[in-house]
A protein has these predicted regions:
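Short loop segments and helix-boundary regions at transmembrane helix junctions
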Residues: 14-20, 79, 99, 116-159, ...
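Hydrophobic core segments of alpha-helical transmembrane domains in multi-pass membrane transport
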Residues: 29-41, 70, 141, 145, ...
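Single transmembrane alpha-helix segments in multi-pass membrane proteins
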Residues: 34-103, 124-131, 265, 269-280, ...
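Transmembrane helix-bundle core of multi-pass membrane transporters
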Residues: 129, 133-196, 223-226, 245-254, ...
């Protein structure tokens, strides 16, 4: 008589991912997004209009594009506070070019090159000179925007070609804007880069312990330089979009964008201390920020109230993980 073997219970690898997915930060963000969407739909009769929802996407995509690259930079343990100033400088250079008769391809190229150049400048100061990124980018924030103010003064550049307007005002299909399409494509690219490549694994390793990563053969300085370049490039892309959408260039353009970008990143679950985060969370946080600010706009809430909200939200999302870790340590002690 043979013994019947007891059935094996092997759902650990299946159950844990399901459980962690249900109780993950991203799942909480989905619930918050749905709740805000519902509140907005009840608060304003215009919110659920298809074209109104399309306008919503213009409210956050330019900042969200920068947030994708900023997420990788913060995960690596660095930060860039100059992104809004990069937009201003790139937009100013495009304005000068259009006054000289440049066409649409040249304008796009100038925006991207200026953004990439500014990001590379930040990266060199941080990686080659060993300066703290927060200090460097506070300095370049003033530098880049100051140059824009010197060039423009109180005037504004206008007269952009009609073909240039597509990037910030055009639609790919029905109410689906070009800006939203570009953001979704970029989100997929950055998700793959961070979560499915060796480059992404190195970014996490650097954020967790840069010294250990260096000893294990990771070229820390090179990767951080690339991340600063990517952040500058995304700011350059955002400058093309916002300049195209507004149809003009002013030195005050995109003022305050850097705080909204960082809020999106941290709200998305990226640790401000580095070493943890996900692109999915950043995408969800971008939609939440867009829903909140657009909903407040429909209710004619003053802009200063939106600024107060963003400031409070940034403090809360930075403080919560730190307080939570402190509580856990006290419980384990």
């Amino acid at each position: 008589m043979t013994d019947t073997p007891a059935p094996r219970h092997i759902p650990d690898r299946l159950d844990k991912p399901l459980t962690s997915a249900i109780f993950s930060w991203e799942a909480l963000l989905v619930v918050v997004a749905v709740a805000i969407f519902a509140v907005n739909s009840f608060a304003s009769p215009y919110f659920l209009d298809a074209w109104s929802l399309s306008d919503l996407t213009f409210n956050f995509t330019e900042k969200a594009l920068i947030a994708l690259a900023m997420a990788l930079l913060i995960i690596s343990g660095e930060i860039d506070l100059s992104v809004a100033a990069i937009i201003a400088l790139a937009s100013t250079m495009m304005g000068m070019a259009v006054q000289a008769g440049a066409g649409m391809p040249e304008l796009v190229a100038i925006g991207l090159v200026v953004g990439l150049g500014c990001g590379a400048f930040n990266g060199l100061l941080v990686t080659r000179l060993g300066l703290p990124s927060i200090v460097v980018t506070i300095g370049t924030m003033s530098l880049f925007r100051g140059i824009a103010f010197i060039i423009l003064g109180d005037q504004a550049y206008k007269g952009y070609p009609a073909s240039f307007a597509f990037f910030g005002q055009g639609y790919v299909w029905w109410v689906v804007s070009f800006e939203l399409t570009l953001f979704l494509v970029a989100a997929v690219v950055y998700w793959f880069l961070l979560h499915r490549t060796s480059f992404g694994r190195r970014v996490f390793a650097i954020g967790n312990n840069p010294v250990a990563a260096q000893f294990s053969g990771v070229r820390v300085g090179r990767i951080k330089f690339i991340l600063f370049c990517l952040t500058g490039l995304m700011a350059g892309i955002a400058s093309v979009l916002i300049t195209s959408r507004l149809g003009s260039t002013r030195p005050s353009i995109a003022q305050g964008y850097e705080l909204e970008v960082i809020t999106m990143v941290v709200l998305g679950g990226v640790s401000i201390l580095g070493g943890a985060g996900s692109i999915v969370g950043v995408v969800l946080a971008a939609f939440i920020m867009g829903l909140v600010t657009f909903g407040l706009g429909l209710l004619n809430v003053p802009g200063i109230v939106m600024s107060i909200f963003i400031g409070l939200l940034l403090i809360i999302v930075i403080a919560l993980p730190i307080l939570w870790r402190r509580v856990r340590r006290e419980r384990l002690a």
